[in-house]
Amino acid sequence: MDKVTFSVFRGHPDESGSPIGEMKEYTVDLDEGMVVLDVIHRIQAEEAPDLACRWNCKAGKCGSCSAEVNGKPRLMCMTRMDDIKEEMGDYEGPVDIRPMQSFPLVRDLVTDTSWAYEVDRKIKPINGPDDPDWVFNQHEADRIQEFRSCIECMLCVNTCHVMREHQKFDEFAGPRFFVRLASLEM
């Protein structure tokens, strides 16, 4: 069993909405098969019961536990600690866990992704061709399923430089909605 140090962002927005806070270190005994979300739950249970973290399914189906782990956008429920160990070279230094940087901070690891749902409501359905003899083939139905596999984790928006570095939320819908429009277009 490894004893690993985690550096976790703790903070909240100030009056202007800018995040203020600090990285706080926690040392956790890892069990075999743990994922990052298990670590967060252990920190909540043993050291920081007020650590805010959003999660729901713990199966990579809902996207609620999106965060940045060692600078990479990931689902905490699907990020195995064994993989982190391999990437870091046997846990050299603390494992860094931060909220998604493209979205407004609510508290600690929780961000406000409501913007995405507001944009989604603005997208109108697209109807099929006007031709009454138009046939929807199986290969078209199969292709749509590819686009519908998106779990709305918003990690693609978090990594998009237009959204992350330039904060163009009013001018650009972002990558998530290109996928949404593509699924409607089919």
Feature-to-residue mapping (PLM):
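A generic, well-ordered mixed alpha/beta core segment in the N-terminal half of proteins
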Residues: S66-A116
